[in-house]
């Protein structure tokens, strides 16, 4: 499922809901909404999606499992937003997740910077990495309804994240994407 709800300054809420067919790709596939690079004061956006996760660590590999993926973003002012994200990282034998809170700043129509805090937790090793992180989001139109996007970040605890994919604008308030996300962190 992918849901995008945008609440503009006039307090009217447009809700769109679409059921997605299963997307079969190798690695971590993400189905949700395309990352934002522009913000208008007072807007709130909710992105809900699914991710198929495969875990690898020191010769260990756990099979794919579908997970919840979601973000809520609120524009504090034009070009500046705060975002909370939850990313399920569960695989067949490992229960993990990443939660993050970031401040996002628009650089241009196609680029934004983000920085904040991330928490990567794994039940398998009973450990949590609390990380400071920074990164960049890029997005470009490939046509009137299709975007290509990328997101890359680095953080403490030898953490790197990147994501890339394509987004399709179904309506003014709904877009759907399919992409690949990579998360790597030090298991301490």
Spans of features found by a protein language model:
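Residues on the lipid-exposed face of transmembrane beta-strands in outer-membrane beta-barrel proteins
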Residues: 70-74, 101-105, 134-140, 164-168
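Short glycine/proline- and aromatic-enriched beta-strand/turn motifs that initiate or cap beta-hairpins
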Residues: 31-90
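Repeated loop/turn-to-beta-strand initiation elements of outer-membrane beta-barrel proteins
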Residues: 44-46, 78-84, 109-115, 142-148, ...
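Outer-membrane beta-barrel translocator/channel fold
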Residues: 57, 88-98, 117-132, 153-159, ...
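Surface-exposed, polar helix/loop patches in the mature regions of secreted/periplasmic/lumenal proteins
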Residues: 106-147
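Mid-chain, structured segments of secreted extracytoplasmic proteins
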Residues: 81-116
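Cleavable N-terminal export/targeting peptides
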Residues: 1-43
């Amino acid at each position: 499922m992918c849901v995008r709800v945008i609440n503009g300054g006039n307090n009217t809420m447009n809700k769109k809901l679409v059921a997605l067919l299963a997307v079969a790709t190798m690695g971590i596939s993400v189905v949700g909404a395309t990352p934002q690079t522009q913000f208008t004061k007072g807007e709130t956006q909710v992105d809900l999606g699914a991710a198929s996760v495969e875990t690898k660590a020191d010769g260990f590999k756990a099979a794919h499992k579908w997970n919840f993926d979601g973000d809520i973003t609120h524009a504090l002012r034009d070009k500046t937003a705060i975002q909370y994200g939850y990313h399920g990282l569960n695989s067949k034998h490992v229960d993990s997740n990443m939660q993050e809170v970031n401040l996002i700043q628009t650089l241009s129509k196609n680029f934004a910077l983000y920085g904040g805090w991330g928490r990567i937790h794994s039940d398998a090793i009973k450990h949590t990495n609390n990380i400071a992180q920074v990164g960049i989001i890029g997005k470009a139109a490939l046509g009137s309804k299709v975007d290509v996007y990328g997101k890359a970040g680095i953080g403490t605890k030898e953490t790197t994240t990147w994501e890339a994919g394509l987004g399709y604008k179904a309506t003014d308030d709904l877009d759907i994407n399919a992409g690949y996300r990579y998360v790597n962190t030090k298991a301490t």
